[in-house]
Amino acid sequence: MTNKYESPLSARYASEYMLRLFSADMRIQTWRKLWVSLAKAEMELGLPISAAQVAELEAHIQDIDYACAAQREKEVRHDVMAHVYAYGKAAPCAAGIIHLGATSCYVTDNADIILYRDGLKYLRKELLKVVANLAEFADRHKSMPTLGYTHYQPAQLVTVGKRATLWMQDFLSDLEELDFVIGSMKFLGCRGTTGTEASFLELFGGDTQKIDRMNRMIAVDFAFTQCYPVCGQTYPRKLDSRILNVLSSIAQSCYRMANDIRLLQHDRQIEEPFEKNQIGSSAMAYKRNPMRCERICSLARYLMADALNAPMTASAQWLERTLDDSANRRITMPEGFLCADAILRLSQNVTNGLHVNEKIVEKTVREYLPFIATENLMLEGVKRGGNRQELHEIVRICSMNATAKMKNGEQWDLLADLSSHPEFGMTNAEMEAVLEPTAYIGRCPEQVDSFLARIRHQISDITKSDTEIDL
């Protein structure tokens, strides 16, 4: 324990990759790489910058003197200029050409775009691992009948695997949205204080082609093919809103799946992984709580709420820019990524070890199958000469009686009750023969096969993570 607050997202939940991605080292090193790229482009386009100066900048990307920068920031109250100063101390021969023609958002905004792009690509892989786990689970249980629920009340039969495809479909919708966001991300480039590139017109003597080439060169250095065609000082904050929206969408899908598993674990039909020495309760030693799924839901609520921040920030960007986005974005954006990372890692763990208690599932099906089969029994009775309306009334009365006995904890036998009515023209044994669960699952196995065939190419190159989350 320490005497300083530490975010649970970094202390307990997020991966090492995501923590490194949003670390101060990664952020400031990215700033320095952007300064190097700018200097290199300016040199190649004829500005008085030497190869030795560029080489010196490249040699000092990683040796960041945070104490020097912090002291300077206290004096000038400007974080970017504090790091320009610290970088200049590390590379004194190049100190005079660092940040030439640029404004703060050249490094802050472009670095954010780079980190967000890389973070989204990482989350894409994590999302696909969840889908791959569910695909395997769905295929394994595609023909296993289970009780379906509408309004959380017993309905018709589905299969365990078919239900998993509903979760998968949500995740694949998220994947489509995620791919769109990644594919549409653009670089800000180096555009000046209000996006007019006036400083570069001055530097390049009015040569607009050199300005365009400079921006293309810098964008390519960071694997971007496009810059925003127009901008103010910042990149459009609508991008932040898009990003957090898709992270929120992933959280919604994880929440829905985890909540379903929690409901099913209550009935002991399906259970999340439970370790041999895991303790469910400090007082109730027998407990097997769905703590992983509960944690998914808990973190998902936070992420869905976090996503509400970005639209307010995007809508409050005055004219060419205002700074009231800065402090907010420093918190909401990294924590959104860390939270999505944590949720997906938990979801991987759950889906990789999801356990079906087949005997419980079968018992639940047997308990409710007589009710489910009543329509088929009624149709068979009509085939044998019965009156459909009379049979319907008999089914209604017998079903209500059986339900009342269930609620009172009494023994009940719906089929025996129905077969005692000669209007059906069926014996109890003949009615029992109708109770084959697979006759009531419709096209579930076929639907699972068809669905998996359609998405197989999307998950074919995904390999399981070699480091599972330690819970």
Model-predicted segments: where are they?
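Glycine-rich anion/phosphate-binding loop at the beta-strand->alpha-helix junction
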Residues: 174, 232-326, 330
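C-terminal alpha-helical interaction appendages
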Residues: 353-421, 441, 446, 453, ...
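Long, amphipathic alpha-helical stalk/connector segments used for oligomerization, subunit docking
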Residues: 302-388, 394
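Short beta-alpha connecting loops at secondary-structure transitions
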Residues: 19-23, 68-70, 278-298, 320-335, ...
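A helix-coil-helix interface module used to build multimeric assemblies
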Residues: 1-201, 206-217, 280-281, 291-295, ...
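Glycine-rich cofactor-pocket loops
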Residues: 139-161, 271-287, 320-327, 352-372
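A short, charged helix-loop
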Residues: 213-233
